[in-house]
């Protein structure tokens, strides 16, 4: 089985501070084979102890199956529209809207339009 690795970006993921231009990164994600050949693409912008930032783009109709994150989560929609299902609640989210979730909370989603969102994963250091 052949494994495809994403090309290394010119952008650092760690350091005393990291700067990202989200609009530029979204455009970059949409030029990669994962976007052209599938319904989504993502890149980890920052990963350090206790904090991970992941920028994700979804094509209209892309489904995020129900899953649970072991960390606290903040999902910030940058562009597009998506439905987020948490338990028996369904939220329609658009640009500028943010949802936070506690660790272990089951959730699922679907893109209603081509959508970009920033996912922030935060580990509780007191656990």
Where are these regions (language model features)?
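Glycine- and acidic-residue-biased ligand/ion/polar-headgroup-sensing regions
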Residues: 60, 71-87
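A cytosolic small-molecule/anion-sensing beta-strand core signal
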Residues: 55, 78-79, 94-95, 113
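Short beta-strand His + acidic residue motifs that chelate non-heme Fe in jelly-roll/DSBH
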Residues: 64-66, 84-85, 101, 106-112
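Ligand-binding loop in jelly-roll beta-barrel domains
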Residues: 103-127
């Amino acid at each position: 089985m052949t494994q495809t690795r994403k090309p290394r970006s010119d952008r650092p993921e760690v350091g005393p501070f990291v700067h990202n231009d989200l609009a530029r990164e979204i455009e970059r994600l949409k030029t990669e084979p994962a976007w052209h050949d599938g319904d989504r693409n993502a890149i980890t912008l920052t990963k350090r102890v206790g904090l991970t930032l992941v920028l994700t783009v979804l094509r209209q109709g892309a489904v995020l199956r129900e899953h649970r994150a072991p960390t606290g989560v903040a999902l910030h929609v940058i562009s597009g529209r998506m439905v987020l299902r948490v338990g028996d609640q369904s939220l329609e989210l658009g640009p500028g809207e943010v949802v936070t979730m506690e660790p272990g909370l089951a959730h699922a989603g679907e893109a209603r339009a081509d959508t970009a969102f920033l996912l922030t994963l935060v580990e509780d250091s007191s656990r």
